[in-house]
UniProtKB/Swiss-Prot annotation:
Annotated pathway: Purine metabolism; AMP biosynthesis via salvage pathway; AMP from ADP: step 1/1
Sequence positions that bind ATP: 10-15, 123, 132-133, 200
Known function: Catalyzes the reversible transfer of the terminal phosphate group between ATP and AMP. Plays an important role in cellular energy homeostasis and in adenine nucleotide metabolism.
EC number: 2.7.4.3
UniProt keyword Cell membrane, yes or no: no
Main location: cytoplasm
Organismal lineage: Bacteria, Pseudomonadati, Pseudomonadota, Gammaproteobacteria, Pasteurellales
UniProt keyword annotation of Phosphoprotein present: no
Name of this chain's protein: Adenylate kinase
Family affiliation: Belongs to the adenylate kinase family.
Domain notes for this protein: Consists of three domains, a large central CORE domain and two small peripheral domains, NMPbind and LID, which undergo movements during catalysis. The LID domain closes over the site of phosphoryl transfer upon ATP binding. Assembling and dissambling the active center during each catalytic cycle provides an effective means to prevent ATP hydrolysis.
Annotated region (LID), positions in chain: 122-159
Amino acid sequence: MKVILLGAPGAGKGTQAQFIMHKFGIPQISTGDMFRAAIKEGTELGKQAKALMDQGKLVPDDLTVALVKDRIAQPDCAHGFLLDGFPRTIPQADALKDAGVKIDLVLEFDVADEVIVERMSGRRVHQPSGRTYHIIYNPPKVAGQDDITGEELITRADDKAETVLERLAVYHQQTKPLIAYYIAEAEKGNTRYERLDGTKPVEQVSAELANIFNQ
């Protein structure tokens, strides 16, 4: 099963990707991880990507698609893969299609912006240990303090409300058009499109995913 995950940052894609990987034995492919691996291995594509990144330039779509094609040709992808964080734009989706990569299933995690802001801006972290809390869903015993050490909890820069809103604006501008793109592809019979309510409890979303994969 070749799967694309769509959804705003904080919609729960990462949590459910872990569930799918463990339950169905499909590797998760993140373009960020791929670039890091290609650069570390010193592959030709890795060298090209590194040269651009070192200059602060964006890696062009054709190079990213070439890297994705390389990665999905590896033996662990024989039974499928999960693409997370790619494609992000319509040109990238077109490039993937033109490269002959057939997608079986597109999963959209649908969560309203205000819920995402509440989820992410409510996170608190104990930096030394990495323990995470949430002021509503998983509060520490004493507000602002780590349960074990009593040390101060912080809000990561990425989780601050204004940063979350900026990331959501980019998502709506760049990536949301992909939802219409893949719904149209599904209507043509080129893929299957499923929308999940990301506000439901994690276990419920996982159960719905298992049903989708078993259909």
